């Protein structure tokens, strides 16, 4: 998929430069994930965060314990391109 990440470089703090399969690249600031809690609460430890790697099999960023972020979400944040339609949820009909 074009959303697949082929390379990632640490910049500073929670900022990474990502390069995608379609040649586009951009910078993402993943500090917003700290406030999401749950599995992302691990990001409060910057040394943990820096252990990211690109899993080429699934085309996204991963961390050693299996945590990952959807590549289409990262593509949207890095490039400003809209999220694919299939990622949007429909409102429930009452």
PLM ranges: what are they?
Residues 1-94:
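Motif-centric detector for short Cys/His coordination patterns
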């Amino acid at each position: 998929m074009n959303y697949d990440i082929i390379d990632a470089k640490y910049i500073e703090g929670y900022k990474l430069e990502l390069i995608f399969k379609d040649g586009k690249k951009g910078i993402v600031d993943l500090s917003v994930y700290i406030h999401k809690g749950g599995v992302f609460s691990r990001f409060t430890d910057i040394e943990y965060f820096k252990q990211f790697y690109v899993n080429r099999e699934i085309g996204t960023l991963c961390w050693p314990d299996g945590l990952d972020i959807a590549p289409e979400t990262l593509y949207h944040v890095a490039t400003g391109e809209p999220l694919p339609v299939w990622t949007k949820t429909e409102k429930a009909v009452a």
